[in-house]
């Protein structure tokens, strides 16, 4: 199907601007066909850096090939960027390294909507991309940043999971911090990764471990970063 028809299936109005919240394929995979339909692509500068070259992600045991020219962001920024569209102000802000080194938040100012990208997974364990700057400590730091930026009325859009609110951000931070503390203690006591995977997150596994990030994989990333 032509890209224009695909875009029209999303919105009758033309899409003029596409924002990438970070470089991963599940957040940039539509770049080329949305660009073909007339949109320009905006991202943090590290997103373009990773998309321009073959990028290895050890956590997935996969090397992602460089993106085609039409998928490369044409406008990039370092720390902050403000965009005005449809009578709305969008405030973009780069995080310190968290899920990756390219993560940004997008605040829809007038609507009080806050999009976190993959610095927030609502009731799902997150993937942490150590190969491109991510870490469990960075993910927790970003969670703290997100909590500080919203009110009880803010609508929070995660990178994965259902739309949430401040309480969900707090829960996510607490789950990550609790897992990190338990894993760090076990690692300091000399426990191996295999031993650590034996259920320090059992309390949250039933609800949080049903996404593509299993409890074992999540604990592997936590263990790596402690």
Predicted features by range, described:
Residues 16-24, 42-45, 114-117, 149-150, ...:
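Active-site neighborhood of phospho(di)ester-bond hydrolases with catalytic His/Asp-centered motifs
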Residues 23-29, 48-52, 100-103, 121-125, ...:
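Active-site environment of divalent metal-dependent phosphoester hydrolases
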Residues 188-226:
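C-terminal regulatory/interaction regions
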């Amino acid at each position: 199907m032509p890209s224009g028809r695909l875009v029209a299936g999303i919105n009758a109005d033309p899409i003029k601007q596409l924002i990438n919240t970070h470089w991963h394929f599940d957040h940039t995979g539509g770049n080329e066909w949305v660009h073909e339909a007339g949109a320009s692509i905006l991202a943090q500068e590290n997103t373009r850096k990773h998309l321009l070259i073959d990028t290895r992600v050890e956590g997935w045991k996969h090397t992602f090939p460089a993106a085609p020219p039409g998928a490369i962001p044409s406008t990039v920024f370092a720390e902050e960027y403000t965009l005005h569209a449809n009578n709305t102000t969008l405030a973009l802000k780069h995080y310190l390294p968290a899920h990756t080194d390219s993560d940004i938040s997008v605040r829809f100012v007038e609507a009080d909507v806050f999009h976190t990208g993959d610095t927030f997974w609502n009731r799902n364990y997150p993937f942490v991309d150590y190969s491109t700057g991510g870490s469990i400590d960075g993910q927790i730091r970003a969670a703290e940043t997100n909590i500080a930026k919203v009110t009880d009325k803010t609508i929070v859009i995660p990178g994965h999971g259902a739309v949430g609110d401040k309480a969900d951000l707090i829960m996510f931070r607490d789950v990550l911090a609790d897992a990190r503390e338990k894993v760090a203690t076990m690692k300091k006591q000399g426990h191996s990764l295999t031993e650590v995977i034996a259920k320090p997150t059992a309390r949250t596994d039933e609800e949080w471990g049903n996404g593509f990030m299993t409890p074992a994989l999540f604990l592997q990333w936590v263990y790596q970063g402690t």
